[in-house]
UniProtKB/Swiss-Prot annotation:
GO terms for MF: protein-macromolecule adaptor activity
Disulfide bonds: none
Identification of the protein by name: Nucleoporin ndc-1
Organism: Caenorhabditis elegans
Positions in the Perinuclear space compartment: 101-122, 181-190, 277
Encoding gene, per UniProt annotation: npp-22
GO biological process: mRNA transport; nuclear pore organization; protein transport
């Protein structure tokens, strides 16, 4: 995880300042032996012996307590999301049965029956049964699949994914069969139900393997009736319906093909009469479409409940000798934890502070008492700087490997090349010391070890899709891209806000370093994208554009805010050139 390692690319002075100003880290700097040796759990007693004197219990830090509290909170939210999805599935069940009860042969009585059937107690057992089964299936999907660092698609070889397909199929088949029985529908007793079962099986596989289970924050947070209405109206129903229609058409086509090919062998040629049964086609396509639509809407509900933002306070300017568990859950402590989901919440909260919360920004720009140190600013800025600096270094190293300047190429160098010439550029060195012998010519013509996958065949693509192929490790994942985007937007928006709100100048002291890091990272991403242009797999380039957009918008805001004052920073010419190129300004 980026930002978790303390041996990152920041200077020793910054690390020392961070350890000095972070109260949570200061508590954890003592050796483990001193705390464990004084613990009563490790003292010898007449009734208890210690098996090994070298075994010491790891002390529980405030970071462990924060993570335990957060995991308990997320567990409660996931159960609540599962119950909400089960409630939504119950509503879908009631609507499905009501539609199945409609018939043109008895319009008035069927309409009355479809509207009031669920009120009678004899129908409650089926409704409760479907609701419980839906809650169980939703909880399994949320716990096993819904993660903040989840891939866009699950691999076909994933055991839990295959189990999820089986559970989704059983749950949905139970849903459909119960609806047919309650509505007294004829398709539950013929070969039609076999075709419907096949369509549901394929639709279940599409639900699991083509759904995006990544946990992410919603743009609209539901906390009132008005925000609930806004959230409902903001959903892209046209896009969702198009995707659901395509997946439903795949399942529908498979069921029709089954009737054409297998139907005569199982039920005789009478099975072909289903092809002329219009209600059968409507029900078949409608069941597949509602299954896909329910899966998309339920994921929106899960993100709305599980990913509800948490507001973390800042520590007071004075030292608290015996803080309560609530007082230890401060933003500087939370942003330093190892839990990826908790750090994601912390960076989102920091971004919210930088953009919308003027009252809490006062704490960021405040000084500690006594001492008057910018403790809060250092505590929230250094993790963001480490994260962005690590990404910059990875971009630089990966770009060098793509163009062939890596340590793997040293084994093809000629042994007769002088040692001093190794500092020369590669092409210049080859031109100066290329020999006429066949061995030297073969070595100079050796291919560069790059990861060019442009000639990947059809079988390789199929194996990669099914999860059997060996895929290249991405330089940055989608989760890391969102993390770095949040860090950049929070950090540099605080720089912009400091122009009018930083009374003590705690941010202006780091302004040159922050702008330098911003320009270096933009240049590193641009170099990597150019080196990646000839490679077929551009997944990480797509994710990098998320970070690149945040960095460029941040640079434009900083330059617009400070304007001509940036000339006093004496930035290097390459960084000034980057600023002029992106911001289209001549002030530097």
């Amino acid at each position: 995880m980026m930002g978790d390692s303390h041996s990152s690319f920041t200077t020793t002075t910054d690390e020392h300042l961070y350890n000095q100003f972070s109260p949570g880290r200061r508590k954890n700097d003592f050796p483990a032996a001193s705390s464990s040796s004084s613990s009563p759990n490790l003292r010898r007693s007449p009734n208890r012996t210690v098996s090994s004197p070298r075994v010491q219990q790891k002390p529980i830090t405030i970071f462990d307590q924060i993570v335990d509290w957060f995991q308990a909170e997320i567990s409660v939210r996931k159960r609540l999301a599962g119950a909400a999805c089960g409630y939504l599935s119950t509503i879908f069940f009631i609507v499905t049965v009501s539609i199945l009860k409609l018939t043109i042969w008895a319009p008035f009585s069927s309409v009355q029956d479809s509207l009031a059937w669920w009120i009678y107690p004899n129908a409650w057992a089926s409704i409760i049964f479907v609701g419980i089964a839906s809650v169980a299936m939703s909880l399994f999907s949320i716990i096993k699949f819904c993660k903040v660092d989840q891939l866009p698609r699950l691999a076909a070889t994933d055991t839990f994914a295959l189990a999820g397909v089986a559970l989704e199929f059983v749950t949905r088949l139970t849903f459909v069969y119960t609806a047919f029985c309650v509505a007294d529908f004829s398709f539950s007793r013929e070969f039609a139900f076999v075709a419907i079962s096949l369509a549901i099986a394929i639709s279940s596989a599409l639900v699991v393997f083509r759904s995006d289970y990544q946990l992410n924050f919603s743009h609209i947070q539901v906390n009132s009736v008005k925000t609930l209405i806004d959230f409902g109206t903001s959903l892209p129903y046209a896009n969702i319906s198009e995707i659901c229609g395509i997946d439903a058409a795949i399942s529908y086509t498979a069921a029709v093909a089954l009737i054409l090919v297998v139907g005569p062998m199982v039920s005789g040629f009478s099975a072909w009469w289903l092809l002329l049964n219009i209600p059968f086609h409507v029900v078949l396509f409608g069941l597949c479409f509602t299954q896909q639509f329910y899966s998309k809407i339920s994921m929106k509900i899960v993100n709305q409940i599980v990913m509800k933002p948490i507001s973390f306070p800042f520590p007071p300017p004075y030292t608290v000798h015996s803080p309560t568990p609530e007082q230890t859950r401060t933003l500087p402590n939370v942003i330093e934890t190892d839990d990826s989901l908790l750090k994601f919440f912390a960076l989102h909260d920091l971004r919210t502070i930088a953009w919308n919360d003027e009252k809490r920004r006062v704490d960021v720009f405040s000084l500690s008492q006594p001492g008057k140190h910018p403790r809060n600013w250092k505590a929230v800025s250094l993790p963001c700087v480490r994260m962005l600096d690590e990404l910059c270094s990875r971009m630089t190293v990966s770009a060098a490997r793509l163009v062939g300047y890596s340590w793997d190429d040293h084994d093809i160098e000629n042994e007769d090349v002088p040692r001093d010439a190794l500092l020369m550029p590669r092409k210049m060195r080859e031109m100066a010391y290329r020999g006429t012998g066949q061995s030297r010519q073969q070595k100079s013509m050796a291919p560069i070890r790059s990861h060019n996958t442009q000639t990947v065949g059809l079988l390789s693509k199929i194996s990669n899709f099914l999860g059997f192929g060996v895929t290249e490790k991405l330089v940055i994942s989608r989760f890391d891209a969102h993390m770095n985007a949040y860090a950049a937007e929070a950090l540099y928006m605080l720089v912009v806000d400091s122009m009018g709100e930083d009374r003590f100048g705690v941010v202006q002291k780091d302004l040159k370093d922050l702008i330098t890091l911003l320009c270096k990272l933009i240049a590193a991403i641009d170099t990597y994208e150019r080196a990646k242009a000839s490679v077929a797999d551009k997944s990480d380039v797509t994710f990098l554009r998320i970070v690149d957009a945040s960095l460029k918008s941040s640079l434009q805001r900083v330059v617009t805010t400070f304007g001509s004052h940036l000339s006093s920073l004496n930035l290097p010419e390459e960084h000034s050139r980057t600023i002029r190129m992106i911001c289209l300004t001549d002030e530097l």
